[in-house]
Amino acid sequence: MSGRVGDLSPKQAETLAKFRENVQDVLPALPNPDDYFLLRWLRARNFDLQKSEAMLRKYMEFRKTMDIDHILDWQPPEVIQKYMPGGLCGYDRDGCPVWYDIIGPLDPKGLLFSVTKQDLLKTKMRDCERILHECDLQTERLGRKIETIVMIFDCEGLGLKHFWKPLVEVYQEFFGLLEENYPETLKFMLIVKATKLFPVGYNLMKPFLSEDTRRKIVVLGNSWKEGLLKLISPEELPAHFGGTLTDPDGNPKCLTKINYGGEIPKSMYVRDQVKTQYEHSVQISRGSSHQVEYEILFPGCVLRWQFSSDGADIGFGVFLKTKMGERQKAGEMTEVLTSQRYNAHMVPEDGSLTCTEAGVYVLRFDNTYSFVHAKKVSFTVEVLLPDEGMQKYDEELTPI
C-alpha cells in the first residue's frame, strides 16, 4: 500500500490513529492537521511511529525558530528580490504547482557579499511556504487534494563559479532543511539543460537528499522540451521551456512569475569576503615553493581551492605531473593553470578547475621570487567527484 489517504493497509491505518493520538498536544499548532499532513511524516519515516513523532516535534521547533507562521509577511532584502533566480509558474497536468530554479544567472559571490546566509535560507523557507499555500489554493479550486509540487532545475550556464564553497554549503543546508521539514512534498525534480558539471553538483547535494527524493530526480536529455510537455500542458509551460505560456506583453520567459537573476552590482555589497576556516597551514621559506599533490583517477573531477597568505602576496599555479614517484620542478610539468601572483593577504583567493584527464595534479604555492620574506599560507583543497549514477546521461549533457 502507498501509505496515502485511501490506500492504507490495516497496519498503516492503525499507526496513523496512534500517531494522531501521540501528537494531539501539537495538533492545534499545525498548519493543517488532517490525515494527508500526518501521513507525510509517517511515510518519510517508513511508518516508524517513534521516528515520525520525533521528526514532527522537531519540525514544530523549526517553525518557531524560523517564525514560519509569519514568514509570508516577511520581505526579503532588496538584493534577493531582484537577483535571486526562481519562481512559481503554472501547473502540471494533475494540477500540481511548478517551481522553477534558474541556476546559470545565479551570482554566488554577489549574493553572499550582499546578504547573510540566514537571509538566503529564510527566503528559501518562505518560497516553500508560498508553494504549500498554492497547493492549498489548488485543492480549493479543483475540489481534490493537491499536496505535491514539480521542481524544474534549469542548469544552463552551470559552471565552476557555482561550486564556490560558501554557496554550496548554503544549498546543502537548504536541502537538509527541506528534507527534515517539508517531507513528501516533491512529486518530481526535473533537470533540464544539464552541463557536464551536473554530476559533480549532484554528488555534492546527494548526502543531504533522502533515498525517496533521489528516486524522484529525472534528468531530461536533448529532448527535454518534449519531456516537460508530457507532464505539463503547453498553456501551463512558459514558451521559453517549450510551451505556449507568455507574459501579457508576450515575453516567453514569463518574467512576471520567474526571476532570472543576474550579476549583482558591487554597490550593493556589504562585505568583500566570507569568513573561511582553512584545513592546512604551511610556512614557505623565502626563495622556495610548496607543492600539494592530488591524484585524479578519471576525467570530470573538479579541483576546488581556497587560500590566503599573511603579510604579502603569493604565487599560485596548477600543474600536471609528467613523471610519477618523484618531485618535479614547475618547468618539468605540464602547466594547467598559469602560475601568477595573488594578493591573498588582502582578499582570500578561491578557484576551481575541471580535470580533463586523469593523473597527479600539483597545486604549487610559489615564493621563489621573494628573497627577503617567508610566507605563511593557509589553504583548503577538495576533489569533487561526479556521481557515478549520472554517468549514463553523459552523452546528452551539454558541454560547459
From Swiss-Prot:
Keyword field: Lipid-binding, Phosphoprotein, Transport
InterPro entries recorded: CRAL-TRIO_dom (IPR001251), CRAL-TRIO_dom_sf (IPR036865), CRAL/TRIO_N_dom (IPR011074), CRAL/TRIO_N_dom_sf (IPR036273), GOLD_dom (IPR009038), GOLD_dom_sf (IPR036598), SEC14/CRAL-TRIO_domain (IPR051064)
Tissues where this protein is expressed: Detected in a layer of supportive cells in olfactory epithelium, in the apical region of the trachea and in the surface layer of ciliated bronchial epithelium in the lung.
Domain CRAL-TRIO: 76-249
Pfam hit, one: CRAL_TRIO
Residues with the Phosphoserine modification: 223
GO molecular function: lipid binding
GOLD domain span: 275-383
Entry keyword Transport: yes
GO cellular component, one term: cytoplasm
Post-translational modification: The N-terminus seems to be blocked.
Function as written in the Swiss-Prot or TrEMBL entry: Probable hydrophobic ligand-binding protein; may play a role in the transport of hydrophobic ligands like tocopherol, squalene and phospholipids.
Protein name: SEC14-like protein 3
Record organism: Rattus norvegicus
Originating gene: Sec14l3
